[in-house]
Amino acid sequence: MKTALKIPGFVDLQVNGFVGVDFSSEALTEEGFIHAARTLLERGTAAFLPTLITNHEALLRRNLMIIVRALKKDAMLDRHILGFHLEGPFISAEPGAVGAHNPAAVLAPSCEAFDKLREWSDGKLRLLTIAAEAPGADQLARHAVACGVAVSCGHHLAGPDDVARLAEAGATALTHLGNGMPNQVHRHNNPLLAGLAEERLKVLFIPDGHHLPRHVLKVFARAAGVERLIATTDAASAAGLPPGRYDVLGNHAVLDPDGRLHNPEKQCLVGSSATMLECMNVLHALGCFSLDDLLRTGFYNPLQLIGTDPAEIPSCKHGITFAPDAGFALS
């Protein structure tokens, strides 16, 4: 039996693009952003943070200002866009940690550079991902938090001491834990275990069926607990498109029929093709989350991280229903 949910949809803190529009591309336009965002809002996502990845300052400035102008043109859309997530440029440039980001555009943590980015975002920067082990990361974290920006650790090679130092400086989350790190790490001193062990940090993770296997998702559920978990998509520009070959985040990418989005040459994932609705159904299929747990992971916890009242999230064209045997669906 289907039950209509009281939430307007899910909240996604990491959306890099949708239906062919890349928020970090030099080809981004106001019209393109509006089209991508409005389309995403029809797929079960009620609110999200447009996410820009590591890039040179000129392009970050350009694209932040394009999105700001787009939101001033579209008052309806502006209510669903909760601000920006900057996933870089203050990350690690080391292989494995840098992922699909451009290592040449990585910057050392800098309060001055952060202030420029925040200005270009029209004060709408809500989440910042930084490498916990980078010199100056703790100073930047304190500064960002003082400006009302949540800080998340990610794309790094941090150990337990680094992660604890960032938590002490005010960081409150981990960006897509289990990804953005080398395939092979020290069995004890590694970003994955360091992040899980730090109880002060929420765990952002990508349950799209490709970034993390089922047994790892279950480990996260049991080790972190639902109060710390935040599902995100890490959706790339190929999300919402049919299988094929695409340019994604500056990478040649293949979108397989099963939804896996990857670069065959680098042998790495280049974001996700999933929506929050699809990710939440992956979690439901694990059988270890109650409906209340799922709603916390996909709606309440992300809003708590960025300090947004759930009552502020407006309704969408489609509501969400839930059935124990079928999971979530659009109404």
Model feature map: region roles:
Residues 16-24, 34-63, 79-92, 121-133, ...:
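Divalent metal-dependent hydrolysis catalytic cores, especially in the metallo-beta-lactamase
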Residues 304, 308-331:
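C-terminal cap of metal-dependent C-N hydrolases
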Residues 291-302:
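Short, well-structured alpha-helical segments that form the helix of a local strand-helix-strand
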Residues 162-293, 308-309, 325-326:
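Active-site-adjacent C-terminal substructures of enzyme catalytic domains
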Residues 58-69, 97:
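Metal-dependent catalytic neighborhoods of phosphoester/phosphodiester hydrolases
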Residues 1-7:
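Histidine-rich, glycine-flanked metal-binding segment
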Residues 9-11, 152, 173, 231-232:
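Residue-level marker for buried hydrophobic side chains located in beta-strands
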Residues 86, 93-190:
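Divalent metal-binding pocket/active-site signature
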